[in-house]
Curated annotation (Swiss-Prot):
One matching Pfam family: Spermine_synth
Organism this protein belongs to: Hydrogenobaculum sp. (strain Y04AAS1)
This protein's name: Polyamine aminopropyltransferase
Complex formation: Homodimer or homotetramer.
Keywords: Cytoplasm, Polyamine biosynthesis, Spermidine biosynthesis, Transferase
Length: 280
C-alpha cells in the first residue's frame, strides 16, 4: 500500500501526533478497546489502543525500563512482583531481568492485548513463557483486593486514566495497593505528562499521599507520548525511591544508576508543583 498517515486521538493532549505508516498489520476490537498494529518506516511496528500510541518498536525501551527499574533497584530484595496492566509484556520483561525475582504476576483485563503482543511484538512479549511469570486476564482493581502483605513491588502500567483504567488512579485503589504490599513494599505507576496533564499528576500524587508515608515523582522523555516529559509516581512504605539499594546489574539500553538519580525532580521544584505554584 502507499504511505498513509495515522493521526493519534489522545483525549488529554492539545496536539495530535501524525505517523506515516506503510502497512496496517492488525485491526480489531476487544471487549474493552480498539486495538491496532501498524508498520512505520521510522518507528517499526506500533501498538495503538483506542487511537492512542502505546509504544513503538524503535523506542519502547525508554518507557518500559523507566517504569520498572527505579523502584526495583530502590527495593533491597524484590522477590514477588505484581504488574497491573502491561499486557504487552514489556514491564514483565524488565522485571524478570532481576535475579532476585521469584514470581511476577501480570494482571491485564484484556486478553486480546496479550495475544496481539505475542504475535506482533515478540521482543516485548518475550518473557511471558518464563516459569516465574503468571499471566492472568482479570480486573486488576478487583484482583488486588484479595491480597494483604503479599508483594514486594507493585507496578501499574495502565492506559490513560479514562474508561476502565480510571479506577487505577483513585484513593481507594491506592489503599488496596498499600495493603497488598509487604511492610517494605513500593509502588509505581505512570502518571501522564507534566506539560499537558499537570493537574492529573498533582491529583495522582495527592491521592498516593493518603496511603503512603513516602511519595515521590520522577520523569523521563518519551518521544511518542504527547507532552514528551512523562512522569512516574512512586509510593513507598520504607525505601527512599531516590536511592539505589543494590548494584545495577541488569542489561539495559537506557536506565542506569546515573539516570536513576537524575530522573527525580529537585525537591524544591517538586514541592512547587504539589503546592500549585508551578504554572505556565
Amino acid at each position: 500500500m502507499k504511505d498513509v498517515y495515522f493521526m493519534e486521538r489522545d483525549p488529554y493532549a492539545p496536539i495530535r501526533h501524525c505517523y506515516g505508516i506503510s502497512k496496517i498489520l492488525y485491526e480489531g476490537k476487544s471487549k474493552y478497546q480498539e486495538i491496532q498494529v501498524v508498520e512505520s518506516h521510522y518507528f517499526g511496528k506500533i501498538l495503538i489502543l483506542d487511537g492512542v500510541v502505546q509504544f513503538t518498536e524503535k523506542n519502547e525501551f525508554f518507557y518500559h525500563e523507566m517504569l520498572t527499574h527505579p523502584v526495583m533497584f530502590a527495593h533491597k530484595n524484590p522477590q514477588n512482583v505484581l504488574i497491573i496492566g502491561g499486557g504487552d509484556g514489556g514491564i514483565l520483561r524488565e522485571v524478570l531481568k532481576h535475579k532476585s525475582v521469584k514470581k511476577a504476576v501480570l494482571v491485564d483485563i484484556d486478553k486480546d492485548v496479550v495475544e496481539v503482543s505475542k504475535k506482533f511484538f515478540p521482543t516485548v512479549a518475550c518473557s511471558m513463557d518464563d516459569p516465574r511469570a503468571i499471566i492472568l486476564n482479570e480486573d486488576g482493581f478487583k484482583y488486588i483486593q484479595d491480597y494483604k502483605n503479599e508483594f514486594d513491588v507493585i507496578i501499574v502500567d495502565s492506559t490513560d486514566p479514562v474508561g476502565f483504567a480510571h479506577v487505577l488512579t483513585t484513593e481507594e485503589f491506592f489503599k488496596y495497593v498499600f495493603e497488598a504490599l509487604k511492610e517494605d513494599g513500593i509502588y509505581v505507576g505512570q502518571s501522564e505528562s507534566l506539560h499537558y496533564h499537570l493537574d492529573i499528576v498533582v491529583r495522582f500524587q495527592k491521592a498516593l499521599k493518603k496511603s503512603f508515608p513516602i511519595v515521590d515523582l520522577y520523569t523521563t522523555v518519551i518521544p511518542v507520548y504527547a507532552g514528551y516529559w512523562w512522569s512516574f509516581s512512586v509510593g513507598s512504605k520504607v525505601y527512599n525511591p531516590r536511592e539505589i539499594s543494590r548494584e545495577v546489574d541488569v542489561e539495559t539500553r537506557f536506565y542506569s544508576d546515573e539516570i536513576h538519580k537524575n530522573a527525580f525532580l529537585p525537591p524544591n521544584f517538586y514541592q512547587k508543583i504539589l503546592n500549585g505554584n508551578f504554572k505556565y
